[in-house]
Curated annotation (Swiss-Prot):
One of the primary rRNA binding proteins, it binds directly to 16S rRNA where it nucleates assembly of the body of the 30S subunit. With S5 and S12 plays an important role in translational accuracy. One of its GO terms (biological process) is ribosomal small subunit biogenesis. One of its GO terms (molecular function) is rRNA binding. It comes from the Bacteria. The gene is rpsD. Residues 97-157 form the S4 RNA-binding domain. NCBIfam families: PRK05327.1 (NF003717), rpsD_bact (TIGR01017). Transmembrane segments: none annotated. This is Small ribosomal subunit protein uS4. It comes from Ralstonia pickettii (strain 12J).
Amino acid sequence: MARYTGPKAKLSRREGTDLFLKSARRSLADKCKLDSKPGQHGRTSGARTSDYGNQLREKQKVKRIYGVLERQFRRYFAEADRRKGNTGETLLQLLESRLDNVVYRMGFGSTRAEARQLVSHKAILVNGQALNVPSAQVKSGDVIAIREKSKKQVRIAESLTLAEQSGFPIWVAVDAKKMEGTFKQAPDRADIAGDINESLIVELYSR
């Protein structure tokens, strides 16, 4: 399945919640009706969505939030299922520990897509070494920094300013002036914001 390149707001409307694909720090709720489906007047249907439909919809939503394709997502679930503990929570922790997501959480990119681009263009250092693999897993204590020659990019400075205003997640420590941060640990489930019901995904793959 190819990566979606169409209007970002349309995906958020389809899921009925802001996926933060277009703007990481500003909600789409003020710009469009998230409670109506895409279309001129929104698609309506009297049919009740099945349990399977709800489970599939939740999986699609999480894939879109983190920008992960189906094959990657299955691998993440298999790894989460293999580990001890709550499978759904572990799945979200694995997704949150992706390098592109950590770059986004530290405010270097205004969206995950922009953060992924920074990683792919070798603008990111991990423990002093350039790493251009968006899916790389970040570990506790890893230091993420903007490469020296990329620090002059206006979009990075603007994104950091917005991130400082809205606040950073508690599992990262960011020095905005140095344009670097430390990944303290994978987040607890309670610290992961967003309208996500990971139990539906576990149910889907347990069918």
